[in-house]
């Protein structure tokens, strides 16, 4: 049976995909991205921790890990779900911007959360106390050291467009209307380059769409899983 590999993003954990894990008709494996210092290493570990055919479901940085899994072991990937992600290599000036956040996280993780999280969200959700508390708690659990290690992995990330055209498995891309960090255009570029991809756009959500709009994101993924793998879990 196919296993869903649920992959969180930067300074995140299994909470990102909790609603999907509870609803999914297939067994799932919660990925831990806290231990490796490269996207390739994260992908390699997840492939080693699992068996058989996989659908890798990644949010943000986790989407990059999912694509890398398909690059490393195409025979094992039955499908990919890529939410709020991107494909570009490191950009000019990115290292300095990231370093400022690394320094802030080491100085005060709460101040880091206050600086980093609001720009990631749909502006209408910044005042949502329950959502913000859940996100801040997740950042605290990750901590400054994990954040720094994961930033190092992101700064060394590959140009995924170099291998996206060779990913033969079906891909569901999930973009959010208010995501300024990973805009819809990036997802359209991935969809155009991949042999078999479709795009779902979530309204009233930013970069943390799986937590901002969990019902809508879960519904999009469940519908895609049913269309692509319905016979397997009927």
Per-segment meaning from a language model:
Residues 71-72, 76-113, 119-120:
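Flexible "cap/lid" loop of the alpha/beta hydrolase fold
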Residues 169, 183-192:
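Short alpha-helix in the alpha/beta-hydrolase fold that links the catalytic acid
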Residues 205-218:
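Catalytic histidine-centered segment of alpha/beta-hydrolase-like enzymes
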Residues 58-62, 66:
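Gly/Ala-rich beta-loop-alpha elbow adjacent to hydrolase catalytic centers
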Residues 191-207:
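Catalytic histidine neighborhood in serine/cysteine hydrolases
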Residues 167, 173-175, 179:
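Short beta-strand/loop motif that positions the catalytic acidic residue
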Residues 1-45:
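Conserved HGGG/HGGXW glycine-rich cap/lid loop of the alpha/beta-hydrolase fold
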Residues 90-93, 108-166:
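Conserved alpha/beta-hydrolase catalytic His-Asp/Glu region
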């Amino acid at each position: 049976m196919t296993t869903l590999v649920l992959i969180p993003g930067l300074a995140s954990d299994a909470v990102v995909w909790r609603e999907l894990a509870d609803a999914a008709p297939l067994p799932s494996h919660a990925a831990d991205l806290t231990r490796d210092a490269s996207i390739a290493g994260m992908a390699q570990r997840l492939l080693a921790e699992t068996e058989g055919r996989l659908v890798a479901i990644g949010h943000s940085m986790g989407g990059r890990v999912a694509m890398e899994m398909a690059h490393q072991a195409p025979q094992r990937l039955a499908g990919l779900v890529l939410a709020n992600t991107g494909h570009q290599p490191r950009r000019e000036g990115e290292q300095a911007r990231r370093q400022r956040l690394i320094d802030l996280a080491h100085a005060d993780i709460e101040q880091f959360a206050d600086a980093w999280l609001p720009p990631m969200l749909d502006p209408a959700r910044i005042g949502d106390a329950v959502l913000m508390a859940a996100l801040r708690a997740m950042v605290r659990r990750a901590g400054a050291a994990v954040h720094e290690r994961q930033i190092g992995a992101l700064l060394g990330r590959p140009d995924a467009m170099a291998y996206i055209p060779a990913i033969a498995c079906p891909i569901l891309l999930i973009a959010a209307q208010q995501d300024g960090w990973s805009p819809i255009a990036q997802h359209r570029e991935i969809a155009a380059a991949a042999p078999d991809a479709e795009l779902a756009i979530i309204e009233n959500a930013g970069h943390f769409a799986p937590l901002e709009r969990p019902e809508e994101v879960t519904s999009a993924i469940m519908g895609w899983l049913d269309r692509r793998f319905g016979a397997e879990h009927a």
